[in-house]
Structures are given as C-alpha cells and as structure tokens.
Amino acid sequence: DGFQLVHSDARLHPHLNLEKRITVVGYMNKGWVSEDTGYLEFWTDDMKECWKQVEPKFNRVVIFENSEFSNHGIPHVNKDRRVFMYTLLCNETFYETRTKAWYKARPEEENHDLVNEIGVKRLKLSDY
C-alpha cells in the first residue's frame, strides 16, 4: 500500500558491512494528482514538525543523506506509486553502526497501537 512509518534508515548493511550514505528516490507516476497522496515526508529529529513534503510527481528525483537525523516516511497513499530507489553504500563508517531502522511516531500517532505493532514487526523482520 506504500504506507511507511517515519524512520531513519539502518546505517550499516548487516552482511556487507558497508555504511548506507545516500538514498536516491525517483518517481515514475504519470498522471499523478495531489488527491492520490503518497507524499514523502521529512521530519525534525524531535518529531514536532514535518519540514518538507515531496509530491511523487513523474520524473521527480529526491536525494537525501542517511543519518540518524534523516527522519522520513509516507503517511497515507490513495493510489499505487511507481518509484525506483538507489542507495549509495560506502566502506568508511562516519556515523553509528546501527543495522536496524529507528521508527518514530508522528505527533498524531504517538500512542497508536498500529505504529507500535508495525514498527516492532519490521524491526524483527529485516536487518536492512
């Protein structure tokens, strides 16, 4: 469905021992309109403000650094989105060596069971 909890990505690939540095997301959604939703959101570290929403328009590319402060997610999707994603991995480690994503609740989700349940399940399912 495209829904994605706000999180900062895992920093270290669990098998390759390479640090995830940069993420590139490209949108291929011809005919997308704002009612389709699926905005990529970026949040402050304290989760008090969504400082940027990116519309998944056709031919749009988003590039962002992966760090413990790059909180991002997709709150709601009305229509399937088509995206490609590329991740730059480096063999030098500048940040912490976390192999799991950190999930964070948006202000309206703070005590929401679904957020806690999905976050815990995803942490258990995947190391990257």
Regions found by a protein language model. Give the residues of each.
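Charged, often glycine-rich, active-site loop that binds/positions anionic groups
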Residues: 1-12
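Catalytic core of Fe(II)/2-oxoglutarate
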Residues: 11-22, 30-128
